[in-house]
């Protein structure tokens, strides 16, 4: 009897799912829902030079490193992408990503367009990039206000930055307008399912098809 989940057992290479959006467009919520609903997807843990905060755990929230350690990683090409933000450095470590891909595990990257560009320069064939847009700038402002996290001046700065980020939408493989969170999540989930089935990500298909053609039916 052929097992019902035979297709999922065919060996495949993992993928790197890149999610980007301006602040308030829903990226973090969609990413969290993906991680909670899909055990085959794991969040890429960044390296940072910023000090650890109270409840943060090494290797779970970040890999905390000194500036000297960070520079050593950068200079030895151990980072896939990096950026300096407010005086602290953040980066994606190469080794965990490459290991996950080889083992058929998928990694989620919650990064901006600059980080996405750097990842594509080094790992283009493995990347599935999705940009999430708000339905309108007015709605984006309303969402930022509803979060009640920032002063008005900060919100205006976020909106200005959002326009700059949105300018890069054409650099992504897929673009989703998040006017309904459930629908946007379903669309992202559908992209992940389809991309996992791409022939070039499933090297195990060669052995499977070879065995299929050699199989005797009598």
Swiss-Prot record:
* UniProt-listed Enzyme Commission number(s): 2.7.4.8
Q: Which SUPFAM superfamilies match?
A: P-loop containing nucleoside triphosphate hydrolases (SSF52540)
Domain (Guanylate kinase-like) spans: 14-193
One Pfam assignment:
Guanylate_kin
- InterPro entries named in the record: GK/Ca_channel_bsu, Guanylate_kin-like_dom, Guanylate_kinase, Guanylate_kinase_CS, P-loop_NTPase
- Keyword Protein biosynthesis listed? The answer is no
GO molecular function list: ATP binding; guanylate kinase activity
Keywords associated with the record: ATP-binding, Cytoplasm, Kinase, Nucleotide-binding, Transferase
Q: Where does ATP bind?
A: 21-28
Q: Does the keyword Disulfide bond apply?
A: no
**Catalyses which reaction?**
GMP + ATP = GDP + ADP
Would you indicate the residue range of the signal peptide? none
Q: Which GO terms describe its cellular component?
A: cytosol
Which SMART domains has this protein been placed in? GuKc
Task: Give compartment(s).
Answer: Cytoplasm
Q: What does this protein do?
A: Essential for recycling GMP and indirectly, cGMP.
Q: Which NCBIfam families match?
A: guanyl_kin
Q: Which protein family is named in the record?
A: Belongs to the guanylate kinase family.
The family database entries (PANTHER family) matched by this protein are listed as: GUANYLATE KINASE, GUANYLATE KINASE-RELATED
Protein name as catalogued: Guanylate kinase
